[in-house]
Regions:
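Alpha-helical interface subdomain recognition
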Residues: 1-125
Length: 125
C-alpha cells in the first residue's frame, strides 16, 4: 500500500507506531491468557479473568482489522483473493471479529461483569 504522497505504508510513522502498540497489546493478552490458565488450574474455576480477556481481545481484534483495512485498501472489501493477497480470509476475519464482540455476552455485559466482580461496583439498573 502507498500513501497519497507515493510513500509506502511502512514509511508512515503513525502506522508503524500503531502496529507497535498492537504488538504490545497482543503480548499483554498472551500474559493475561497465561495468568487465567494458571488461576483456573490452581482454583479449579476460570474466574472473571475470562471476561477481562474477552473485552481486551475483542478490542485488539477490531484494531488489527482496522490496520489491515488500511494496508489492504480496496482489496479489504473483496471476499475473493486478489493479486496474491488472502484478503478473502481478511474479510472473514473482520466479520468474525464482530461476532466475537457479541459471543459469550456482549461487550457491555462483559464490562458489567468486570465492574461488579472485579472492581466491586454496584449492579447496573
Amino acid at each position: 500500500a502507498t500513501t497519497s504522497h507515493g510513500a509506502t505504508a511502512w514509511e508512515d510513522r503513525g502506522l508503524r507506531r500503531e502496529i507497535g502498540h498492537l504488538a504490545a497489546e497482543l503480548d499483554a493478552l498472551w500474559a493475561l491468557t497465561r495468568r487465567n490458565i494458571s488461576q483456573a488450574a490452581r482454583d479449579g474455576v476460570p474466574g472473571v479473568g475470562g471476561s477481562v480477556f474477552k473485552l481486551a481481545y475483542s478490542e485488539v481484534r477490531q484494531k488489527l482489522g482496522d490496520v489491515s483495512d488500511r494496508l489492504l485498501e480496496r482489496a479489504a472489501l473483496s471476499m475473493d483473493d486478489l493479486d496474491g493477497l488472502t484478503n478473502g480470509r481478511h474479510v472473514q476475519g473482520r466479520l468474525h471479529a464482530l461476532s466475537i464482540s457479541i459471543a459469550a455476552g456482549t461487550t457491555q455485559i462483559q464490562r458489567n461483569i468486570v465492574g461488579e466482580r472485579v472492581l466491586g461496583l454496584p449492579k447496573e439498573r
